[in-house]
């Protein structure tokens, strides 16, 4: 099997960085439903190292984190050659037009405000992962 075929047949890997257990549980449920593999972190201090080592297909990054904020983590990810091109979604309780602009200027590919609908999260993940999800796992979510 070629490397390209191996890549498309593997489940996408998502790195989730969230310090609230209930939010982690919700995100892991959504990712499991989509058929994704995932790594959950509640401490942002090692996010850059984990991203470099595992090369996830997508990162879901809370903004209001202890130790390093999501914006600080994002700056580190964008400076690192091994992680600069990994799509990152800001997952935040901060809502508003000015916040959206701030996140996009910081390099986030998108953002979702808490509380969010699982369907909205799943559509966003599907869009950002393009063809890395198996069609059967996202058929209902991504169908237009």
Where are these regions (language model features)?
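The feature encodes the CheY-like receiver
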Residues: 66, 84, 96
């Amino acid at each position: 099997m070629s490397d390209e075929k191996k890549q498309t047949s593997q489940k996408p890997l998502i790195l989730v960085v969230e310090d609230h257990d209930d939010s982690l549980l919700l995100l892991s449920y959504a990712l499991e439903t989509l058929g994704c593999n995932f790594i959950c972190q509640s401490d942002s201090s090692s996010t850059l190292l984990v991203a470099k080592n595992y090369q996830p297909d997508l990162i879901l990054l809370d903004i209001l984190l202890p130790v390093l904020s999501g914006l600080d983590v994002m700056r580190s990810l964008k400076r690192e050659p091994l992680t600069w091109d990994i799509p990152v979604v800001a997952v935040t309780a901060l809502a508003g037009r000015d916040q959206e602009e701030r996140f996009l200027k910081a390099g986030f590919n998108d953002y979702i405000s808490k509380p969010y609908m699982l369907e909205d999260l799943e559509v966003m993940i599907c869009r950002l992962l393009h063809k890395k999800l198996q069609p059967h796992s996202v058929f209902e979510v991504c169908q237009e």
